[in-house]
From Swiss-Prot:
Disulfide bond residue pairs: none
Name of the protein: Apo-citrate lyase phosphoribosyl-dephospho-CoA transferase
Key words of the record: Nucleotidyltransferase, Transferase
InterPro entries: CitX
Keyword Nucleotidyltransferase: yes
EC number(s) per entry: 2.7.7.61
Length: 183
């Protein structure tokens, strides 16, 4: 289920392409939920800027896939099906996991908080009925900015930071993880 970093497209995605890609992801999620009546983990990489598919995002994605598989194994949860693909919005993974949806969401939240790359992962858990379990459902604050600890949404809307600074921080986090062999 890993993606080859050297095959990244480096395509600068437009807003309309991004919106179509998100609609297509939602349609794929519904197909998966019909095929597997268990919770679905939908996993993407948080990538600022217009280039969503790069060597860096694919390497970050691959670490996330490894961490999600390890989480399922540790908890004794069966992965019924898994797939990876690349869309206009970057690397995407889907894993149908036989586990209680709320427990799965809590475990993925903990993974996002505990793993050094967790802030670069967007891990959604959908119930078998298609409901997305949100951070708000667990009274958690919004995602923090990579650079200043403010709300990431506020910094993104206000263009508080230079794109190069955000991308450099992403790459530094990835290089630290690779240097320490963290999965």
């Amino acid at each position: 289920m890993h993606l080859l970093p050297e095959l990244a497209s480096h395509h600068a995605v437009s807003i309309p392409e991004l919106l179509v890609s998100r609609d297509e992801r939602q349609a794929r999620q519904h197909v998966w939920l019909k095929r597997h009546p268990v919770p679905l983990v939908s996993f993407t990489v948080v990538a600022p800027g217009p280039i969503k598919d790069s060597e860096v995002t694919r390497r970050i994605f691959n670490h996330g896939v490894t961490a999600l598989r390890a989480l399922a194994a540790k908890q004794g949860w069966q992965i019924q099906e898994q797939a990876a693909l690349v869309s206009a919005s970057g690397p995407e993974g889907m894993l149908s996991i036989a586990a209680p949806a709320r427990d799965l969401k809590l475990a993925t939240i903990e993974l996002e908080h505990s793993h050094p790359l967790g802030r670069l992962w967007d891990i959604d858990v959908l119930t078998p009925e298609g409901e997305i379990l949100s951070r708000r459902d667990y009274s958690l604050p919004p995602r923090r900015c990579l650079l200043c600890e403010q709300s990431a949404a506020v910094c993104a809307r206000g263009k508080t930071h230079q794109l190069t600074d955000l991308l450099n921080r992403m790459e530094a986090l990835l290089n630290d993880v690779d240097a320490c062999n963290v999965n």
